[in-house]
């Protein structure tokens, strides 16, 4: 059994035995590992969390919030090993046993399109209900989704359905909007030492911004930061930024 096996077994199928084995191996005891968890939580700004065990099961004084979980996930995703595991749907352990991500197990029953969920971790307790954190893709952008307190009704895991509903909502209501066209005149500046008195500043290409489809164009403000005049020496050079 390897550390990699334990990491995959902890994250993909939510193996409580794997998390406890890691705790003993890395910190010599569950309590020591919990202390390490709380120390790191404070370090990364998780002000409304306190951990008592390494399994996530309900117990007195063990709690967190969705906003704190977002901080934790953003921090963890900076680690390439974690990100690789988090975005894996299925993995073969060194003993040949195959472990699947819980969303894949859910979907064996629900038969939904989960291809846009790039990575995920689910959980359940009586107090928190069905939970999920995920990275998903919409219109070539990646987003983090975290929810709690979902239900299981008639074969439907609503933490997964909620995630898919959010993806559909983003697909329909948000996209890359052309906020400034390359043909738009940003600013007109004088040209020195030339028979051409002025130059119209344009973008080199259209500016695309991810916004709601019904965004108000009057809310878009364009600021130019660059040269206030040019000469022939500036030909084919960048003269500023927008």
Label the predicted regions:
Residues 1-67, 74-80:
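Active-site-adjacent loops and short helices of periplasmic peptidoglycan-processing enzymes
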Residues 46-50, 61-242:
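Domain-terminus/edge residues, biased toward the C-terminal soluble/receptor-binding domains
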């Amino acid at each position: 059994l390897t550390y990699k096996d334990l990491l995959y077994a902890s994250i993909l199928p939510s193996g409580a035995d794997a998390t406890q084995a890691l705790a003993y191996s890395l910190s010599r005891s569950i309590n020591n590992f919990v202390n390490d968890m709380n120390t790191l939580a404070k370090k990364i700004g998780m002000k409304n969390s306190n951990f008592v065990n390494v399994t996530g099961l309900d117990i007195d004084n063990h709690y967190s919030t969705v906003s704190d979980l977002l901080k934790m996930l953003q921090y963890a995703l900076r680690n390439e090993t974690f990100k690789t595991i988090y975005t894996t749907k299925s993995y073969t352990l060194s003993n040949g046993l195959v472990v699947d991500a819980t969303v894949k197990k859910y979907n064996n029953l629900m038969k939904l399109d989960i291809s846009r969920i790039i990575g995920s971790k689910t959980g359940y307790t009586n107090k928190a209900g069905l939970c999920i954190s995920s990275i998903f893709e919409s219109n070539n952008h990646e987003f983090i989704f975290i929810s709690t307190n979902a239900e299981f009704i008639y074969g439907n895991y609503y933490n997964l359905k909620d995630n898919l509903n959010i993806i559909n909502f983003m697909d329909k209501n948000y996209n890359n909007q052309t906020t400034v066209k390359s043909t738009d005149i940003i600013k007109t500046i004088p040209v020195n030492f030339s028979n051409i008195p002025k130059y119209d500043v344009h973008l080199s290409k259209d500016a695309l911004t991810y916004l709601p489809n019904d965004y108000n164009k009057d809310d878009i403000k364009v600021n130019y930061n660059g040269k206030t005049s040019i000469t022939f020496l500036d030909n084919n050079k960048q003269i500023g930024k927008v």
